[in-house]
């Protein structure tokens, strides 16, 4: 739900197939509200062996740069990742990032989207990460809450209304 991933791998039929692994990770306030949370995030990234990591809830608390801190923590664990400064959502890549763009900037904690360009061999890869505005999540309707005011309202129980696919 938090991830918009677009990958352009124009591999010709004569090339060997290339694969990569992506981890999408909502790090819940950078792990700051859980004892040992930051280290647990770093350990899970290492355990996943992901080539690309997309992050939700990057906050840059106390004027720090979360992506710089996590890249350093991963380096201390023997892993090399690259990143760039973001707010709210973030990207890590095992491959050097050649370009990055803010697609949708964070505004009043209403979500964000970023794009990174990297290369796997001669193939350009575009990776997007998004953290959507939490106030308009569909599951609030089924639970009987307005995501903007938190007022109770009758839950939406009509299956046709809740259905994503016809």
Residue ranges and their predicted role:
Residues 5-14:
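Hydrophobic h-region of N-terminal signal peptides that target proteins for export
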Residues 164-166:
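A long, amphipathic alpha-helix that forms part
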């Amino acid at each position: 739900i938090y991830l918009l991933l677009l990958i352009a791998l124009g591999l010709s039929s004569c090339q060997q197939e290339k694969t990569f692994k992506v981890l999408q990770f909502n790090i819940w306030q950078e792990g700051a509200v859980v004892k040992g949370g930051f280290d647990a995030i770093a350990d899970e990234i290492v355990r996943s062996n992901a080539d690309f990591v997309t992050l939700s809830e990057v906050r840059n608390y106390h004027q720090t740069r979360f992506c710089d801190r996590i890249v350093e923590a991963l380096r201390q664990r023997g892993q090399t990742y690259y990143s760039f400064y973001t707010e709210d959502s973030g990207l890590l890549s095992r491959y050097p990032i050649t370009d990055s763009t803010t697609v949708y900037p964070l505004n009043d904690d209403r979500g964000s989207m970023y794009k990174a360009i990297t290369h796997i061999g001669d193939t350009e890869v575009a990776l997007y990460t998004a953290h959507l505005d939490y106030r308009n999540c569909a599951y609030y309707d089924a639970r009987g809450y307005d995501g903007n005011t938190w007022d109770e309202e009758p839950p939406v129980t009509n299956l046709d209304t809740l259905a994503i696919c016809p």
